[in-house]
Amino acid sequence: MPKKRRKLNKDFEKKIYTSKKNVELVLAKIYDIDDEDIQKEYMSAFNDVVYSYDQLKNDYELTGFNDNSDKLISDYIKAFSLFESEFEI
């Protein structure tokens, strides 16, 4: 039986790309922190954001744009906003 094609969405791909760049930027800033204890604190807080981004990216790569996509991007945005509000970087 032929494999079902993923449904693609260019606007959603742009959001994923922007999310990737935001995650990379914050991780670079965290790695630049000299104090190891503070760096660990920031990394543990940022892990939720990275996890949300990974779920978003993996879901899109495996199944494409679907009913769950909007929820995943919303979860990522909430996690990123929460991190930004609690930590100054």
Question: What are these model-predicted stretches?
Answer:
Residues 1-10, 14:
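Short Lys/Arg-rich cationic patches that frequently serve as NLS/NoLS or arginine-rich RNA/DNA-binding motifs
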Residues 4-7, 21, 40:
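Positively charged, low-complexity intrinsically disordered regions
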Residues 12-23, 42-52:
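Short amphipathic alpha-helical heptad-repeat segments
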Residues 22, 31, 48, 66, ...:
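Compositionally biased non-globular segments, especially hydrophobic aliphatic-rich helices
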Residues 26, 30-37, 60-63, 87:
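Secondary-structure edge/capping motif, primarily at the C-terminal ends of alpha-helices
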Residues 66-89:
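Amphipathic alpha-helical binding modules
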